Amino acid sequence: MFGDRQRPMVLVLGLGESGLAIARWCARHGCRLRIADTREAPPNLAALQAEGIDAEFVGGAFTPALLDGGVEIVGLSPGLSPLEPALAALVAAANERGVAVWGELEFFAQALRALGTSGYQPKVLAITGTNGKTTTTSLTGLLCQRSGKKVAVAGNISPAMLDRLASAIDETALPDVWVLELSSFQLETARTFAPDAAAILNITQDHLDWHGSFDAYAQAKGRIFGATTTRVLNRDDAAVMKFAPAVAAADAPRTVTFGLNEPTQDGDYGLSRDNGIAWLVEAVDRDAPDEATTTRRRKRDAAHTPDIAQKRLMPADALRIRGLHNAANALAAFALARAIDLPAAPLLHALREYRGEAHRVEVIATIDDVDYVDDSKGTNVGATVAALDGLAQKIVLIAGGDGKGQDFAPLVAPVARWCRAVMLIGRDAPVIRDTLAETGVPLADHATLEAAVHAAAELAEPGDAVLLSPACASLDMFRNYAHRAEVFRAAVDAIAIDKGATP
């Protein structure tokens, strides 16, 4: 379970959800445990003690002295930035001493490798990206379930991977397929993780304070791929396509792309438009329409020039999730499931079934022919751009909050194209106002979200949407993005009551 180490001494840094999962896993396997957190009494300390886990706890600043006493592995919680000076010094000291530094994902990869010696060989699918991870992960899990597989969905989406694995072992119900949502934080410490197929949905500016630069952030995303992992890539995103192999050599990893245009390479996915209807399609070689995609791709790699046709899968409008960005998410999920040879028919039925996740371009009410859309999970610029372009209708946008140092310039074009007006809230409203001034779209500042919602309702016309997609974090005004969504919903409910409508 720990490489070539038997019951090692493990130092767990950070007692969040992943840190607690690492501690549980290590205790389960007889490791000696030292747990450190910069907080003297982190919330999960009580849970640790209640479960009777035998561990030394050290509160306060991290120092290299935490490695003393024979520490062999450092278990690093994903919320801890490697750029933080005290942590950087500790990690450097660990490297000098030959102490392994793993995150939860590496513990999970090592555990699967150990279980593999007993014959357990599940398929592993992994999803990352700045936006759309949770939707695509949940949808991929559903697709696999509807194909008759026993599925575990875990990771950034919760539950923690190690907790889910432990419960599966205890219940003697190990899944056929693991579907993992992975953040850049979790991938930063990946070393031997090698899923069967993995998708990068998009890469836009986010968490730059944690990673230090956009390039470092993108490189962390790329750690989702092992040497033989099928790569599912968004061909509309240049940063993502940097992970496509330069040459389709015989030993190159298989690559499948998806996008919002017609695919031109055999086995890729996209959208095709005909008589005003958008279709989800797969590019197929007319010479081998019934062969498996892997076989068709071997032909292409051998200098075969395919005669490409667009095989219609289903109308995009048959999806219950709104927006073109969700059509892209659906294509990514379908591509992942097909990469492990699941049959297409049940996958297509499941695509029609999936209703989406809360707070992600979720239509919560329609009042006087105006849609009220909760995208409170849109905590970065890329998410809001995707929501605006995906809805593709006139919108009164509500944006603002803690901008996390982002560049808001990518909002200019979609705001100019789609927005009737923009209501601004939160700490970085002035920064967004300055950026959007050139659009000529009316901009209004509001002290509260409730005031912004009521003002947006007054401006919206039939056929419009009032969209909460802040492009910012929520903590300057709210407990979290879910609390922000609750306030939005309450304001919409009040409008419905005022108008005598049912939200």
From Swiss-Prot:
HAMAP family: MurD. It is found in: Cytoplasm. ATP binds at residues 129-135. It catalyses: UDP-N-acetyl-alpha-D-muramoyl-L-alanine + D-glutamate + ATP = UDP-N-acetyl-alpha-D-muramoyl-L-alanyl-D-glutamate + ADP + phosphate + H(+). Its EC number is 6.3.2.9. InterPro entries: Mur-like_cat_sf, Mur_ligase_C, Mur_ligase_C_dom_sf, Mur_ligase_cen, MurD. It comes from the Bacteria. Pathway: Cell wall biogenesis; peptidoglycan biosynthesis. GO terms for biological process: cell division; cell wall organization; peptidoglycan biosynthetic process; regulation of cell shape. NCBIfam families: murD (TIGR01087). PANTHER family: UDP-N-ACETYLMURAMOYLALANINE--D-GLUTAMATE LIGASE. Keywords: ATP-binding, Cell cycle, Cell division, Cell shape, Cell wall biogenesis/degradation, Cytoplasm, Ligase, Nucleotide-binding, Peptidoglycan synthesis. Belongs to the MurCDEF family. This is UDP-N-acetylmuramoylalanine--D-glutamate ligase.
